[in-house]
């Protein structure tokens, strides 16, 4: 991503380091990628995998102890064919935008002629004056069917904010995501499926706790804090 003046609003497509691209952001920024003290990383909510058709909220973090302005560009490709787009992106806020290959236009739906999609920073997303790190969040929806492994390519720019290409630091990284089978729907047991949470017997009164027995339930938990118990009454929401 280019944070010289002309590209503060986001770079042209094709600078993530993916195969067949123009290179990385070092094409316009002096220096060698990954030579500074910082880094770029992508945070995946469920680990480095994907469920076909299931949208994930991804988070890109660019960090460098010395820098004060930030940018990124990211794309998703099929591992078996790096020229094939893998899913689609949707910005979560004004800090990122979607562009298509061979187009400087801000457009979320790419044509058949330019099917490769990128997500990158906007001018607002550069957050000039913010020190040490910046994060960008957006949604990625993988293909609706299993296409095998998917590779995420990302380049981050940790800039010094002088509006020139000197002193900026470029960081790159890639991640390979494996397909994950869609989880089965929860199933409540036929016998003793829903019972009173205190007595473990049938008969549910309004406002009471219940115990639900079955299979394929999620592993998430919820712990109530002391300040949530008011006048001896426990919370009734998760």
Question: How should each PLM-predicted stretch be described?
Answer:
Residues 2-141, 145-182:
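Sequence context surrounding c-type heme c attachment/ligation sites in exported
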Residues 182-236:
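Beta-strand/beta-sandwich contexts
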């Amino acid at each position: 991503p280019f944070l010289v003046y002309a590209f503060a609003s986001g770079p042209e497509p094709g600078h993530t380091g993916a195969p067949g691209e123009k290179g990385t952001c070092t094409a316009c920024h002096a220096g060698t990628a990954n030579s500074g003290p910082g880094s770029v990383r992508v945070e995946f909510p469920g680990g480095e995998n994907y469920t076909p058709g299931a949208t994930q909220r991804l988070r890109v973090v660019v960090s460098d102890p010395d820098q004060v302005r930030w940018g990124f560009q990211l794309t998703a490709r099929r591992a078996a064919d790096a020229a094939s787009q893998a899913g689609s992106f949707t910005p979560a806020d004004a800090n990122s935008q979607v562009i298509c290959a061979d187009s400087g236009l801000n457009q979320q739906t790419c044509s058949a002629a330019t099917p490769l999609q990128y997500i990158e920073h906007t001018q607002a997303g550069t957050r000039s004056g913010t020190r040490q790190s910046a994060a960008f969040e957006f949604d990625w929806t993988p293909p609706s069917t299993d296409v095998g492994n998917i590779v995420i390519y990302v380049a981050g720019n940790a800039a010094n904010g002088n509006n020139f290409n000197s002193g900026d630091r470029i960081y790159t990284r890639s991640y390979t995501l494996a397909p994950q089978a869609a989880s089965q729907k929860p199933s409540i047991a036929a016998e003793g499926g829903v019972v009173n949470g205190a007595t473990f017997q049938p008969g549910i009164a309004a406002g009471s706790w219940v115990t639900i027995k079955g299979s394929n339930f999620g592993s998430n938990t919820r712990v109530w804090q002391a300040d949530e118990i008011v006048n001896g009454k426990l919370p009734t929401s998760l």
